[in-house]
């Protein structure tokens, strides 16, 4: 089963690759080539991108910044990533539009739901930047929100690990991977996949979440085709 309309959540860290900070052009190129394969299958793809490779609001808040101010700085970081991703996508021939939750008309369109859906219908990729435009909400929650708004069939969370585990697989060799689990299990066991607001939004709107490894070439197109390459939350 190939999904027809997908919301892909890319963390800022995914764009960082092995670098300690910023954007790795090779990773952007690899993601762009994968996205091209997806678009060629006539799949409608929207992307929400994080900003943790540049600035993380929670970290800024922990370091003494006002939380709302820190979150706004984080939103600007996501716009930088969105524009960089647009550049990478267009270099491989993928028509792309960036829409931001905070208006900045000189560099991106404002987020307008109907316009975003029209872009998708025309075969363009839409990259959402600026989070949801409000502090105190993560980009994972933005992904769940935008997925519900554009009627996406699935949220695909691209991460550094190949699915959801019962504990950190980088620290514990006996970590158990889940092939599937329920929203309720994630919420009740406080499994660190997404924040609880994002999980609850997906649960309330019956949008499944696929968690998979972004660094394995071809995984985006495999996930879109419904191949069991990660963990499915439903």
Swiss-Prot record:
GO biological process, one term: 'de novo' CTP biosynthetic process
Name the UniProt record assigns to this protein: Uridylate kinase
Organism encoding this protein: Prochlorococcus marinus (strain MIT 9215)
Superkingdom of origin organism: Bacteria
Keywords in alphabetical order: ATP-binding, Cytoplasm, Kinase, Nucleotide-binding, Pyrimidine biosynthesis, Transferase
UniProt-listed InterPro entries: AceGlu_kinase-like_sf (IPR036393), Asp/Glu/Uridylate_kinase (IPR001048), Uridylate_kinase (IPR011817), Uridylate_kinase_bac (IPR015963)
Annotated gene: pyrH
NCBIfam families xrefs: pyrH_bact
A GO term from the CC aspect: cytoplasm
Family: Belongs to the UMP kinase family.
Entry GO MF terms: ATP binding; UMP kinase activity
Function text: Catalyzes the reversible phosphorylation of UMP to UDP.
């Amino acid at each position: 089963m190939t999904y027809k309309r997908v919301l892909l959540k890319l963390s800022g860290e995914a764009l960082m690759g092995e670098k300690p900070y910023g954007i790795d052009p090779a990773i952007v190129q690899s993601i762009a080539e994968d996205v091209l394969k997806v678009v060629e299958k006539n799949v409608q793809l929207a992307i929400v991108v994080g900003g943790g490779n540049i600035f993380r609001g929670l970290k800024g808040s922990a370091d003494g910044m006002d939380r709302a101010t820190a979150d706004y700085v984080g939103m600007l970081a996501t716009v930088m990533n969105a524009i960089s991703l647009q550049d990478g996508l267009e270099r491989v021939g993928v028509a792309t539009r960036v829409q931001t939750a905070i208006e900045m008309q000189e560099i991106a369109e404002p987020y307008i739901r109907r316009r975003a859906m029209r872009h998708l219908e025309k075969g363009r990729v839409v990259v959402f930047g600026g989070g949801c435009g409000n502090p105190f909400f993560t980009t994972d929650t933005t992904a769940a929100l935008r997925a519900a708004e554009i009627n996406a069939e699935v949220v695909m969370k691209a991460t550094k690990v190949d699915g959801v585990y019962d504990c950190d697989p980088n620290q514990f060799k006996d970590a158990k991977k889940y092939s599937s689990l329920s929203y309720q299990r994630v919420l009740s066991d406080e499994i660190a996949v997404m924040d609880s607001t994002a999980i609850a939004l997906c649960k309330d709107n019956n949008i499944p979440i696929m968690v998979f490894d972004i660094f394995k070439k071809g995984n985006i197109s495999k996930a879109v085709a419904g191949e069991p390459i990660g963990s499915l939350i439903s």
